[in-house]
Amino acid sequence: SIGKDSTVLLWLARKAFFGHVPIPLVHIDTHFKILEMIEYRDALARQWKLEMIYGENVDALCAKDTFPDGNTSRIQCCKNLKTEALKSVLSGDSIRYRMDRQTGNYEPDKNTEPFTGVIVGVRSDEEGSRSKERYFSPRDKNNDWDVADQPAELWNQFKTEFAPGTHVRIHPLQDWTELDIWEYILRENIPVVSLYFNRGNGTRYRSLGCAPCTKPVESTARSVEEIVAELKDGKFSNIA
């Protein structure tokens, strides 16, 4: 989403590889994201010299099988525009679009090889299903997740080998909290999209997604320092 969590994940990758991210960045474009998110994504990709790729569910968009078009539920819309789109992008079954960093334009990606692993910036405290994920979370040959078939992870022991034709999702931020994220952003001075801050109307976004389903919260926080204070001792203290 190029929100705070994925931006922190990118920052960690840049630190690990001395300012360079040697793997593609995949974004799923639902076409309902807040415009500032897309603008920020592209600006960051050019500034940090990221190998930026995006994918989409063209069939669902053309059929208007979406919640904003009034033809399906929010949950089914998320499945259509996010889950199914991600599956086809990872498998290489749908068109991927790659950014030309010189022009900022996107062109169909000639590489259709499947991705066998993807690093994701989800956190266990975001919602129930994510709390059941592992650091190394396998998907089967249909890209489906069997929550009952998760490998045990004890201390620093992780299963990192998986069957051919499957892929693994890696969650380095699994045990980070929202406060951890913002404290790290403050410590490292990481840039984030301005939607997270009160810009004079008494509201800001705590999380970002599609415009029809993402709503701002009442807040006076205009800076990272004020967001940290709000999460530590303010109105959002201990509230997910």
Please describe what each predicted stretch is.
Residues 1-240:
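Nucleotide-activated chemistry modules centered on ATP-dependent adenylation/adenylyltransferase
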